[in-house]
Design a protein with these regions (language model features):
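ATP-binding glycine-rich phosphate-binding loop
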Residues: 2-24
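ATP-binding pocket architecture of kinase catalytic cores
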Residues: 27-124
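Active-site activation/catalytic loop segments of kinase-like enzymes and analogous catalytic loops
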Residues: 245-278, 291-310
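ATP-dependent phospho-/nucleotidyl transfer catalytic cores
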Residues: 12, 32, 122-214, 268
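A glycine-centered beta->alpha junction motif in the catalytic cores
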Residues: 80-93, 144-153, 251, 293-311
Length: 340
């Protein structure tokens, strides 16, 4: 009954992951339940329709129903959305060429998103998210909270002993990253922000208004699909105003962890991005401070604190040990990144 609300001929339907993949006379579409707001949907649609997808970049745009609405209601009252569907496989993060290609397409996406001016009606929580420095500040507090809890415990588990052994080292990195990030975004021009001469008029206006640029917001290899002659970057439900370097960081970090912090690969990914969209000094510093912050370490501590502390799976202890083992390679990459 929901499918009947769309102006297209249905050829076949098959169940996907929590959705229906529909073959129609207008190409492949994806129908899925939606629990968000119409306002959020309209925001995403307004942005995606402005992107030029005639070349090597594709996005999963929404399809409006016969009434011109983005949301379609089923008989039971549940809401559904339809969007373009790409059957292509995910970016293989073990393939250096494919990684670099995916990252160059991300730069292409970012370049287009930078041309889109924020609108007054976009002022909602899901778009104006927590800033990078506030997020790091919260993570530092959470690390301390977990360490203080463990320190007060008797009869520590292997995981807890591992935390006590490594905490000071990683906490120092977290503090340094936070302090530098705060300086970077601080209001005091001489110590924190780049000199006005280094910024364009548009960048200065955005800086004064505390606005960032549109970012994907949840980027990993699962959202980068490699098609024949194009790359589809999908799932914009976490798109927000912020620092675009965060998208690059998320994808790069996933790759670097898989490749044992291979410095040559890391720098080549950065080159692939900057050939399409060069970053300014502030963005590069921001990227460096994101990498300096021990996010994987914080994740393990936060997982521990928020779950059953009496039993921590062995794989979590192994993850902490792996972080320690990979640290020399990670530090070498950080040194190279800082010099870029």
């Amino acid at each position: 009954e929901v499918l009947e609300q769309y102006e297209m001929e249905l050829l076949s339907v098959r169940k996907g992951r929590g959705a229906w993949i529909c073959e129609t006379d207008k190409g492949l579409k994806l129908l899925q339940e939606y629990r968000g707001t119409v306002r959020r949907l309209e925001f995403e649609d307004q942005v995606l329709e402005k992107l030029d997808t005639r070349g090597s970049l594709r996005v999963d745009r929404y399809v409006r129903n016969r009434e011109g609405a983005l949301l379609s209601k089923a008989g039971d009252g549940s809401n559904y959305i339809m969007k373009e569907y790409f059957p292509d496989r995910e970016c293989n993060i073990r393939d250096h060429y494919e990684i670099r290609l995916g990252i160059s397409r991300l730069a292409m996406l970012h370049g287009q998103l930078r041309q889109i001016q924020p609108k007054e009606e976009w002022n909602m929580g899901s778009i104006c998210v927590e800033s990078l420095e506030k997020e790091q500040e919260r993570h530092v507090r959470e690390m301390k909270r977990a360490r203080n809890f463990i320190r007060g415990k008797r009869g520590k588990t292997e995981f807890e002993l591992c935390v006590m052994d490594t905490f000071d080292y990683f906490f120092q990195q977290a503090k340094e990253a936070l302090d530098q990030m705060n300086n970077l975004f601080s209001e005091s021009k001489p110590s924190g922000q780049l000199a006005a001469a280094e910024l364009s008029t548009e960048d200065l206006e955005r800086q004064e208004n505390s606005l960032g640029y549109l970012c994907h917001g949840d980027l990993d290899q699962h959202h980068v699909l490699m098609g024949n002659g194009y790359t589809a970057i999908i799932e914009y439900n976490r798109m927000h105003l912020g620092v675009q370097a965060e998208d690059l960081y998320r994808l790069m970090r996933k790759v670097m962890e898989k490749h044992g912090w291979d410095g040559d690969l890391g720098i080549s990914m950065l080159d692939s991005y900057e050939r399409v969209r060069p970053m300014d000094k502030k963005e590069r510093k921001c990227l460096y401070y994101m990498f300096l912050f021990p996010e994987k370490y914080w994740k393990q501590l936060n997982f521990y604190y928020n779950t059953n502390k009496a039993w921590i799976p062995a794989k979590n202890t192994d993850k902490l040990k792996n972080l320690k083992n990979q640290e020399n390679a990670r530090r070498r990459f950080l040194e190279r990144l800082e010099k870029e």
